[in-house]
């Protein structure tokens, strides 16, 4: 039905400033200076930074995410109001660490629907996969599998089964 539906690819970009703000905003301690100081010889992107790129895309200003995505309809899918969605789970696979800035490169977000599941009166589960890819080389940097739950928006007659996955985190150790 709607499983496998692919949204149009979208460009993503970031600056070193974005990487620094992210590391500071999630409370990286000073002991991990290689995430917090852009002149550190091993300066690198914190591994979970790719999780925000589907929200940020190329914006350098505050993002009104819901307005931007209001027209992202999925053929045959129920009309869910994603303003009420909450994170259910995320699985992040890192194939290659992101560079500290996307300047000089071109990256894109490829987003597809794994499934939308009717959970009855409780609501619906929305399962997606986001891939960050170098648009020139085709090299995949990260894949994120996200399941969001949309409360009180169920009973639309869709499939009820959601396959539960195990979440694995692998962090890259700075070299040097």
Identify the residue ranges that each predicted region occupies.
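HotDog/MaoC-like acyl-thioester-processing domains
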Residues: 1-8, 86-176
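Hydrophobic, proline/glycine-rich low-complexity stretches
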Residues: 1-106
């Amino acid at each position: 039905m709607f499983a496998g539906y692919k949204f149009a690819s979208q460009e993503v970009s970031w600056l070193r400033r974005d990487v620094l703000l992210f590391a500071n905003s999630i409370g990286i301690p000073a002991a991990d200076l290689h995430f917090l100081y852009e002149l550190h010889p091993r300066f690198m992107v914190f591994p979970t930074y790719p999780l925000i790129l589907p929200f940020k895309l190329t914006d350098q200003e505050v993002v009104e995410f819901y307005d931007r995505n209001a027209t992202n309809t999925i053929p045959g899918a129920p009309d869910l109001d994603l303003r009420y969605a909450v994170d259910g789970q995320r699985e992040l696979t890192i194939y290659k660490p992101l560079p500290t800035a996307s300047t000089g490169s071109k990256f894109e977000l490829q987003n597809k629907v794994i499934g939308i599941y009717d959970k009855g009166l409780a609501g619906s589960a929305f399962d997606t996969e986001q891939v960050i890819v170098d648009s020139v080389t085709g090299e995949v940097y990260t894949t994120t599998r996200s399941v969001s739950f949309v409360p009180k928006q169920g009973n639309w007659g869709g499939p009820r089964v959601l396959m539960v996955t195990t979440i694995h985190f692998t962090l890259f150790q700075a070299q040097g």
